[in-house]
């Protein structure tokens, strides 16, 4: 199965895609949040072009699994997305995915100005790869 992963953010949203077998995750792009309408047009277009079997959305939580304001914003985003796209949507809990993505990029020599442009995509890659590495019984569909 092919997946598109979304690391939703209020300024930038990172997108990653899997291979057709659902084994490896790759960065795709970041979508800049201008208006909600423009954002959803770009996102829906990208999803149709990629033709995934399902979507994976990162759900940020704290270390104790408690939810925050951004967690609620992501849940609201998922509700809006499900009205526009008729695909299964899976949640992938995430803690510090952007921080870990930044460390990944620094470790391979990315400079600060380049990191900013690809950070959200790399966070989406981390989210998607974590999802792909889970057994199917561990996956949470909404």
Swiss-Prot record:
Q: Which SMART domains match?
A: YqgFc
Q: Which UniProt keywords apply?
A: Cytoplasm, Hydrolase, Nuclease, Ribosome biogenesis
**One GO CC term of this entry?**
cytosol
In terms of InterPro entries, this protein maps to: RNaseH-like_sf, YqgF, YqgF/RNaseH-like_dom, YqgF/RNaseH-like_dom_sf
Please provide an example of a Pfam family that matches this protein in its UniProt record.
RuvX
Residues making up the signal peptide according to the UniProt record: none
Its EC top class is: hydrolase
- Locations listed in the record: Cytoplasm
Q: What EC identifiers does the entry list?
A: 3.1.-.-
A GO biological process of this protein is: rRNA 5'-end processing
**Main location, first listed in the record:** cytoplasm
Q: Which GO terms describe its molecular function?
A: nuclease activity
Q: Which family, according to the similarity comment?
A: Belongs to the YqgF nuclease family.
HAMAP family for this protein: Nuclease_YqgF
Stated role: Could be a nuclease involved in processing of the 5'-end of pre-16S rRNA.
Protein name per the record:
Putative pre-16S rRNA nuclease
Organism, by scientific name, is Lawsonia intracellularis (strain PHE/MN1-00)
């Amino acid at each position: 199965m092919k997946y598109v992963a979304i690391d939703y953010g209020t300024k930038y949203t990172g997108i990653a895609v899997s291979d057709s077998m659902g084994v490896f995750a790759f960065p795709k792009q970041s979508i800049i949040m201008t208006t909600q309408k423009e954002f959803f047009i770009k996102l829906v277009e990208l999803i149709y072009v990629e033709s995934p079997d399902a979507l994976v959305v990162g759900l940020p939580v704290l270390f104790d699994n408690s939810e925050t304001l951004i967690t609620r914003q992501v849940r609201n985003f998922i509700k809006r997305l499900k009205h526009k796209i008729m695909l299964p949507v899976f949640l992938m809990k995430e803690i510090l995915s952007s921080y870990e993505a930044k460390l990944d990029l620094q470790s391979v020599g990315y400079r600060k100005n380049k990191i900013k442009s690809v950070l959200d995509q790399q966070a989406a890659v981390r989210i998607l790869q974590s999802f792909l590495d889970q057994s199917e019984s561990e996956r949470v569909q909404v």
